[in-house]
Amino acid sequence: MSALTLFHGTLLINVLCLITSAETKLAALVKSQVYEPESAVPASIDCSLLPKMSLLIALYKEKDIAATLIANLGKIIYPPTHLQVIVVLEADDLQTAAAILETELPAWIEILRILAGTIKTKQRALNYALRICSREIVGVYDAEDAPEPDQLLKVAAQYATASQDKDCLQESLSFFNARTSYISRCFAIEYSAKFRVFLPGLAKLECIIPLGGTTLFLRRTIL
């Protein structure tokens, strides 16, 4: 095969991929024209009927934002008896641990110090935390997340109306500092298009949904 033929073949594949991507996004756009907002929180809630949730948050060298994270978690509206929050720390991350211990930790927040290892990744930390998860729904947050206070109630409402084969829920993300700079505005527009247009459209097309690494909720039974 000549170099020219290989080039033309590669070029054709790339063009076809671009066309397919554009067609998929166009189809998702059309399908998502009628945007369905997330499930509303009922006016009155029977707390005993809410699913029990575990939230996993892996931190590494996050001392500057640790106190803000704990404060944001403290604003969550959900029965403490139905909530388990596990903050995972690496064994050598003493500064983040000290920053967290200086805060007033709610009783439903647990600190898990994992064994020292040469590899320090979010996946490894979450796998450690998963071993002690005891709730029906497992959620994943990042250190910089600032969930709306009623977000878990909305998650519970969506699971309550979903069929049993719906095991995963990706909540929408947005930037809280969208107006800070031109770059933050661009990111905010990108996230808005992705989570309010593209992903809802893919869901209606019954396509595979790409999941993010945060604000993600799964049934414990599938993990």
Regions found by a protein language model. Name each.
Residues G74-G117:
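Acidic donor-binding segment of Leloir-type glycosyltransferases
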Residues E104-L105, R113-R131, R135, P149-L223:
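Long helical/loop segments within the catalytic core of UDP-sugar-dependent glycosyltransferases
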Residues V138:
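Short aromatic/hydrophobic "clamp" motif used to bind/position activated sugar donors
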Residues E62-K75, Q95:
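Short, well-formed alpha-helical segments that are part of the catalytic scaffolds
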Residues D142-A146:
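The conserved acidic donor/metal-binding loop of glycosyltransferases
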Residues S54-E62:
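A conserved hydrophobic helix/loop-capping motif in glycosyltransferases and polysaccharide synthases
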